Amino acid sequence: MFAQPLSRSCATGFRRWLAVSALAMALQFTLAQPSVAQAPTSEEIWNELANEIFKGRLLADGTGLVGIEMPTRAEDAAIVPVTMRVTLPLGDPRRVKALTLVIDENPAPVAATFEFGDNAGVSMISTRVRVNSYTDVHLVAELTDGKLYVVKTYVKASGGCSAPAAKNADEARASLGQMRFRTFGNPTDGGASLAQEAQVMIRHPNNSGLQRDQVTLLYIPAHFIEELAVRQGDALLFRMNGGISISEDPNFRFSYLATGAATFAVEAKDNAGKMFRNEWPAKPGL
C-alpha cells in the first residue's frame, strides 16, 4: 500500500505557478512608474514557493549535508539529468528522511519528493527531468531531527515541458507499465553491509498536459507516474511522489545498503489510477 503522497498533485502545481504569476502582476501594478514592467526576481519566486510548499518552516543552508548536480546548459530540455546526493559527515547520527526536488520556473515546480526507508542507506538518487525555462533548481532535505536544509543549482534550458513525446500514443500504450530493474555490484559473501547501486525503469509517457499531438495539434492530457515505491524484500528503499516534471519513461538510479533479501519489488501508480508491479531476484546484471 502506498503512503499518503508527500508531493503536490499536478493540479496543485499549476495553482502554485498561477500564484507566482499573480505575484509578478502584483509587483508590476505597484511600480511607481507604470511604464516599467518588473518581473519578480528568482529569490522572490523561490521565497513564494518555499513558503507554500514548506508552510513557512525555516530552511537552513544544506551545503555539506546534501548536494545536487545538473548540467549548467542542458542538451535536451525534456531529459535533463539530475543527481541528488546525501553527504552527511561521518559520525552524524542523523539521516535524511526525505528529499524534495523543486524546479522553480516549471509549471508544476515540485518535480518529486523521495521518502527513504529507515535502513535503506540511500545516499544517491538520479533521474531525468523536464525544464521549461532558465531556472534555479532547489533540493530540500528533511532530516530525522525535523530540520530542513536546502541547496540549489542553476540550469539553462527551455521548452522541456511542452517538447513532443519521443513515442506516439499507440507505442506508449503498447508498452505502458513495462519495467526493468538492474543491480550493480555483487552483494554476496559479506557484501551485504556494503553500499550497492540499482536502477529501475518504467515505460510511461509521463505526459505533461502541455504537449501537443503532432497530427491533431490538440493538447495531450496529463498522464504521469504519481507514486512509485522500491522495496528490498519487505523493506522500503524509497518512495517517490512525482508529477509532470519527471521525464518520459521514468528512470531512477540509486544507492542502497544490501541486506541479503531475496527479491526486489517495484510498485507504481499513475494519475489515471493504473497500478503496475513487478519483482526480481536479488542478483546483479538483470
Range-by-range predicted roles:
Residues 1-13:
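N-terminal secretory signal peptides that target proteins for export/translocation
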Residues 19-31:
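Hydrophobic helical h-region of N-terminal Sec-dependent signal peptides
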Residues 41-43, 159-181, 285-286:
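Low-complexity, Pro/Ser/Thr- and charge-rich linker/hinge segments at domain boundaries
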Residues 50-77, 171-192:
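N-terminal edge beta-strand
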Residues 69, 81-90, 197-205, 213-218:
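Short edge beta-strand/loop segments characteristic of extracellular beta-sandwich folds
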Residues 117-125, 244-253:
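Aromatic sugar-binding surface patches on proteins
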Residues 128-134, 255-261:
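Surface-exposed, short loops/turns at beta-strand junctions within beta-sandwich domains
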Residues 143-150, 269-278:
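Short acidic/polar inter-strand loop motif in beta-rich domains
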